[in-house]
Amino acid sequence: MTTQTSTGDRLVHQEIIGSRRLSNYLWAIIVTMGGIGFLLSGISSYLKVNLLIVADPTQLNFLPQGIAMSFYGLLGTIYGIFLWLTVIWDLGGGYNDFNQESGQIMIFRRGFPGKNRKVEFNCTTENVQSIKVDIKEGLNPRRAIYLCLKDRRQIPLTRVGQPLALSKLENEAAQLAKFLQVPLEGL
């Protein structure tokens, strides 16, 4: 989450990185290449024609090795296509806008194509009760900033994925609480 403050400190705009992260690009490349490699190995064992550069799968028996390689290759290719689509659609990406001049807060995220492709949440700054920091350590750590509203709703403001560093999380939460002039909870 990156923060840019502009217009005389009356507007805070935070970009949220969605699925267009380096790790997602790397996993999409690896899974797609592996899936296509397995699929070509299975097809090569059936046709007895080498379709790969790095190996000779024509020596494999089609039953059962070739069929298994084709099946896993098909699954890997489909999963690779899914990963590429999530990167192209930038799932989870968006921004948080906090505007003191108009008294409005807008949280925007991108979703899957269709009726709910754009997820928008709007509220007034007067409806904000506090900013909450949620820190859970352990095997599956969670570090998130929430916008707590007076009607008891908690709206997540941080991205999903790799947890933020503690110092960065605390600084961003403190800056946001100071900007909105609300208390900071959870520290």
Curated annotation (Swiss-Prot):
The keyword Transmembrane applies. GO terms for biological process: photosynthesis. InterPro entries: PSI_Ycf4_assembly. This is Photosystem I assembly protein Ycf4. Keywords: Membrane, Photosynthesis, Thylakoid, Transmembrane, Transmembrane helix. It is found in: Cellular thylakoid membrane. Belongs to the Ycf4 family. It is a multi-pass membrane protein. Its main location: membrane. The chain crosses the membrane at residues 25-45, 69-89.
